[in-house]
Amino acid sequence: MTAAASAGRLLLAVFAVAVFVFAQAAGEDNAFMPKGGRALLLDLLGVPPDQTELRAIAQARRTEPEWRDFVAARKSALTERELATLTAYLAVNMPMSEDAVKRGNLASALPPDGRDLAWSGCQPCHSLFASHLTQRRQVQGWRNMFLSPFHRELKMSPQEREEFARYSALNMPMKIEDVPPDLRF
């Protein structure tokens, strides 16, 4: 790679970080987006979550239908879409590594969910509205997005990419009126 190309990439990265920091400083957050699996799990377990119960969930290996039965048995007020989002999150991300499970505050060690990944991964480079929030794709369509050269370079694990794809297929597109005006287009 030439020095000019390296400098250009560095400048682009600095600009993207500056835009992200500015948006955060302006008080914008992702609360307008449908909750992801991590947020739904913490809501389901209550505040603060019982560490023993959270640890048992973090160490469990279940299929997606088994996770669905597990969550449904809790008699929570989740919508069908939220139930699907949470069970997809659990199926993709559990069990967690032993090192993560041993942390004192396990809730903070939970893997990011699709909403977190979209907010931190898409917005720094391009409009979240045009690139994500208004797109309707099946899971494979979202996975295919990571095949493009610029998306292949994203620092996301295969697990994070799958989480993003599953969340996005279940929760996108959003209605235009549900997106804050400052984040449209």
Q: Where are the model-predicted features located?
A:
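Acidic/histidine-rich, surface-exposed loop or edge segments in extracytoplasmic proteins
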Residues: 67-72, 123-127, 147
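Electrostatic cytochrome c docking/interface patches
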Residues: 26-56, 70-78, 82, 88-116
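C-terminal capping alpha-helices of c-type cytochrome domains
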Residues: 76-100, 154-185
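Bacterial N-terminal signal peptides that target proteins for export
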Residues: 1-12
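The canonical Cys-X-X-Cys-His
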Residues: 44-49, 86, 118-129, 164, ...
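Short acidic, glycine/proline-enriched loop segments that cap or flank alpha-helices
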Residues: 77-78, 128-137, 153-156
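Bacterial N-terminal signal peptides
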Residues: 11-21
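Short cysteine/histidine-rich metal-coordination sites, predominantly Zn2+-binding motifs
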Residues: 137-146
